[in-house]
């Protein structure tokens, strides 16, 4: 009889813990963080002459993988160190979520590359069912490009051993 009670007690405890996990999963809160920079050499990555951008606008958009419908959208503006933070409530396991550049505060550095190979957005995973323990999601840095590269760019590219790459 004692063995049977222990089994029932164990099963009951597991059920309670399972329900607590389900209740907690419904309360997913994430924070998406990232930064925006000015790509002063027009090469799609940061260099020592890149500058951070205060006042740049980005948007986070999630779309359902199968239906393609928008399930979440939010915008944020970068602070004085070029960083943004977007609070997100909910779990978007069945979605593709991306950060995109929207608006630059600098008319000299406001182009977004539309080349096929260029990084036009930063994907983030907004689900607690992916093995990430933290609720903070870090997006890759995104950059607006200057209309013309800085005169220092050929030297910068040479320092990086990128002799065949030309700042365009």
Swiss-Prot record:
Expressed in pollen. Keywords: Allergen, Disulfide bond, Glycoprotein, Secreted, Signal. Glycans are attached at residue 64. The keyword Signal applies. It comes from the Eukaryota. It is found in: Secreted. It holds the Pfam family Pollen_Ole_e_1. Residues 1-26 form the signal peptide. Disulfide bonds join 38-109, 41-153, 62-97. GO terms for cellular component: extracellular space. Belongs to the Ole e I family. This is Pollen allergen Cro s 1. It comes from Crocus sativus.
